[in-house]
Swiss-Prot record:
One of its GO terms (molecular function) is ATP binding. Oxidation of Met-44 and Met-47 by MICALs (mical1, mical2 or mical3) to form methionine sulfoxide promotes actin filament depolymerization. Mical1 and mical2 produce the (R)-S-oxide form. The (R)-S-oxide form is reverted by msrb1 and msrb2, which promote actin repolymerization. Methylation at His-73 by SETD3. Methylation stabilizes actin filaments. The lineage of its organism: Eukaryota, Metazoa, Chordata, Craniata, Vertebrata. The modification Tele-methylhistidine is found at residue 73. The keyword Hydrolase applies. The modification Methionine (R)-sulfoxide is found at residues 44, 47. The modification N-acetylmethionine is found at residue 1. There are three different beta-cytoplasmic actins in Fugu rubripes. Its main location: cytoplasm. It catalyses: ATP + H2O = ADP + phosphate + H(+). It is an enzyme of class 3 (hydrolase). It comes from the Eukaryota. This is Actin, cytoplasmic 2.
Length: 375
């Protein structure tokens, strides 16, 4: 498909927005899902200070702005800011006219019905798109891995979901949600670095800690054993240079931080870890399809990017599942963007073209059309 009539694929995550053209193998634009507003009134007249900034520009001016994330735990909570993010996506990042392209949007599993309707309404009424569709994020990740049946453990910045999918349909009764994801791990790393004597407090410093987390953290196969290794030698220590040139050293924090995914009690949470949540999700499904789910457990999202996470999941789920069960954890290298990639694949299939909600259908039925056509 050429860009002239190509569909646009927009994956709105709690932390990052991924956008591009259907048929491409990676998103063209990836930017933070933030809207920033100046903390103080501009001093100089005629400086042309804007009343809001979006994405990277908001990030780079974060010192003078109040930053807000319109998507919390995967679900849109502030529609005015969300509209600003979409506007920025179309006009500044992709540089396209939305009224000329069909748009595929993604949504969190168990997204409230009113939210899908609001998305649909904004696309047709504010941006005048010719056609649109709303797809569930985890289902797209599964498509991207070349499967139509499996269970997806999707963990991003704001929320983690385990979503069993059979023949392309998510099974809503068995979807589980865990409000523990990348942002919580960043906060936890800030906390345990403070214990080492490094203080990180502001929203700007949180971004530095996020970078440390992404570059140096990993998941231990055996947590207790790794703690022992860290205590008895300095082999696990790594150093990181802060923007001001100061060098800090981190040791057991490297694996203590993501360990919270498996032991949420580290964060003072009573929920099950990601391994147990995945197992519970499988157990909520029909006994006949469990075997297919165990053998097709797909990891997706930025918070599954830690080295060692697939081996640890394999080990933990093996100990929970029936002894003879074949368990396979699939961790595609591109899983950070697999939701977007799945959307790109779906929107460029010839069989999908009749699935779009057209402007005409919307005008006839109103926003509720989305429940009939997108499931």
């Amino acid at each position: 498909m050429d860009d002239e009539i190509a569909a646009l694929v927009v994956d709105n995550g709690s932390g990052m927005c991924k956008a591009g053209f259907a048929g491409d193998d990676a998103p063209r634009a990836v930017f933070p899902s933030i809207v920033g507003r100046p903390r103080h009134q501009g001093v100089m007249v005629g400086m042309g200070q804007k009343d809001s900034y979006v994405g990277d520009e908001a990030q780079s001016k974060r010192g003078i702005l109040t930053l807000k994330y319109p998507i919390e735990h995967g679900i849109v909570t502030n529609w005015d800011d969300m509209e600003k993010i979409w506007h920025h996506t179309f006009y500044n990042e992709l540089r396209v006219a939305p009224e000329e392209h069909p748009v595929l949007l993604t949504e969190a599993p168990l997204n409230p019905k009113a939210n899908r309707e609001k998305m649909t309404q904004i696309m047709f009424e504010t941006f005048n798109t010719p056609a649109m569709y709303v797809a569930i994020q985890a289902v797209l990740s599964l498509y991207a891995s070349g499967r139509t049946t499996g269970i997806v453990m999707d963990s991003g910045d704001g929320v983690t979901h385990t979503v069993p999918i059979y023949e392309g349909y998510a099974l809503p009764h068995a979807i589980l949600r865990l409000d523990l994801a990348g942002r919580d791990l960043t906060d936890y790393l800030m906390k345990i670095l403070t214990e080492r004597g490094y203080s990180f407090t502001t929203t700007a410093e949180r971004e530095i800690v996020r970078d440390i987390k992404e570059k140096l953290c990993y998941v231990a196969l055996d947590f207790e054993q790794e703690m022992g290794t860290a205590a008895s030698s300095s082999s696990l220590e790594k150093s990181y240079e802060l923007p001001d040139g100061q060098v800090i050293t981190i040791g057991n924090e490297r694996f203590r931080c993501p360990e919270a995914l498996f032991q949420p009690s580290f964060l003072g949470m009573e929920s099950c870890g990601i391994h147990e949540t995945t197992f519970n999700s499988i157990m909520k499904c029909d006994v006949d399809i469990r075997k297919d789910l165990y053998a097709n457990t797909v990891l997706s999202g930025g918070t599954t990017m830690y080295p060692g996470i697939a081996d640890r999941m394999q080990k933990e789920i093996t100990s929970l599942a029936p002894t003879t069960m074949k368990i396979k954890i699939i961790a595609p290298p591109e899983r950070k963007y697999s939701v977007w990639i799945g959307g790109s694949i779906l929107a460029s299939l010839s069989t999908f073209q009749q699935m779009w909600i057209s402007k005409q259908e919307y005008d006839e039925s109103g926003p509720s059309i989305v429940h009939r056509k997108c499931f």
